[in-house]
Amino acid sequence: MASSSRAFFKVFNPAPKSIPRIGQSNLMQLTHKKQLPTFQRRGIAEDSLLPSSTTPIKPMNVETKHTRTMGDIFVQHCQKLELFRNVLRNVAELDALEGLNMIDAVQRLGIDFHFQREIDEILHKQMSNVSASDDLHEVALRFRLLRQHGYFVPEDVFNNFKDSKGTFKQVLGEDIKGLMSLYEASQLGTEGEDTLVEAEKFSGHLLKTSLSHLDHHHARIVGNTLRNPHHKSLASFMARNFFVTTQATNSWLNLLKDVAKTDFNMVRSLHQNEIVQISKWWKELGLAKELKFARDQPQKWYIWSMACLTDPKLSEERVELTKPISFVYLIDDIFDVYGTLDDLILFTEAVNRWEITAIDHLPDYMKICFKALYDMTNEISCKVYQKHGWNPLQSLKISWASLCNAFLVEAKWFASGQLPKSKEYLKNGIVSSGVNVVLVHMFFILGQNITTKSVELLNETPAMISSSAAILRLWDDLGSAKDENQDGNDGSYVRCYLEEHEGCSIEEAREKTINMISDEWKKLNRELLSPNPFPATITLASLNLARMIPLMYSYDGNQCLPSLKEYMKLMLYETVSM
């Protein structure tokens, strides 16, 4: 059995009998957007629809037609993993395109961590054939998979599909499969790649046009590609759709689906156990009782960790990462809900000093929060030092100080009733989003490739962090700007932009914001390409954070989050039928 399989099951334990339970009513009551003050910071810590620590979680019970022990499931699952691993190697050796299709399927099901070595080997060989085909699907699929894996493939591989005028050939409109692959590939574009911009417009237009004459099944597949391109979506969320829409035409796909179903159920149980650990830590910390104004939603905080760190082997890391995320929410509540401006200034000064004696002049509730933050940060630093031989305390302190400084800037804006310039707002909003705090802690908790150079770069907020943070800030601001009848200054980028561009409509401001999100994605895509000073795990986590954002901030007309509700139901509530 492969080592990756053993490592996966090393962290898997059946859910305890006393595990809490999520009910449908609990999910329903958490779908409304929080009413915000007129100038409200929005970021990681904005309220959404996840439950409180008292919300129970239904225990997972893996069942088939015949009752089997977990040991039986483990053995059979590992056998199937090894079988598919051999099939993947053999098929890719004989048929390059089919090998690419297999990798694509593995990634869409979100279980590529099992086959990383095989994928590495196959894609490395594929670099010599980047444009050796006149099939649009094959060229586009190879381009996307290689770029996702860090290989720089030039955009001119698509020149063979252009006419003498330099535009994509209209005859490609008959190749729906190729157009979908081209659209997917265009999502990997970086700044200045005009061919990929054209590819997205060309393929997107023809695919939308095709919806009217395709049968229901194929129209559903095309529509899903347009709404949820793979590169910008969470595989764990879209995998269920892959099961429904993909019809098996060969034996390897049936085998892969079987492997994925078992994986989903086991990972679901693992996530439930992690939530139990987080809930226990939060309860023992006692802040929910001490600070009545603060949110009490450990499951909500955990969802970020679950989305960012998808490899089951990273169970301990997900639990540890949720702890600083909880303090982002807690401190956000202090700045938003409870603190006076004078108290917030004192609290920010205390965090910048990072001395326990700094709490002497704070009100009691701030003393409690600062002491808990101080202890939690020192505890994480000790764990990182013991496990990885590096003391991250200085970097962690910098991240908390930066967050509080940004929160304070926005508190002063709110107190003055004045809107800042849009650029100033976004620059500060990137920090106050909380993304920097989360990814800095994640880097050290993962403990991979910690060097003086990488730490110095991390402390300077690299593009990997700033782009993810900007995407979060702008996505959230799009949601807050939907209501043109809002009173006052809601502090969104859209409102700031409207304020300084007289005559600009809200539709134009929203279009500007959407284009900025696209530009930030291009910057983030550049960070995926080699050489990258950060390990692949942290880069993927940053990417997954950006993928999670639409689920967290896509409000419907009732100011609800249906996509996030569905994600939570799939990941923690529903089993996959065996």
Swiss-Prot record:
Entry's Gene Ontology cellular component terms: chloroplast; mitochondrion
Expressing tissues: Not detected in leaves or green fruit.
Residues holding Mg(2+) 1: 332, 336
Transit peptide residues according to the UniProt entry: 1-29
Function field: Involved in monoterpene (C10) and sesquiterpene (C15) biosynthesis. Converts geranyl diphosphate (GPP) into linalool and farnesyl diphosphate (FPP) into nerolidol.
Binding site for Mg(2+) 3: 476, 480, 484
Biological classification of the source: Eukaryota, Viridiplantae, Streptophyta, Embryophyta, Tracheophyta
Binding site for Mg(2+) 2: 332, 336
One Pfam family it belongs to: Terpene_synth_C
Domain topic, free-text comment: The Asp-Asp-Xaa-Xaa-Asp/Glu (DDXXD/E) motif is important for the catalytic activity, presumably through binding to Mg(2+).
Cofactor notes: Binds 3 Mg(2+) or Mn(2+) ions per subunit.
Name of the featured protein: (3S,6E)-nerolidol synthase 2, chloroplastic/mitochondrial
Domain of life: Eukaryota
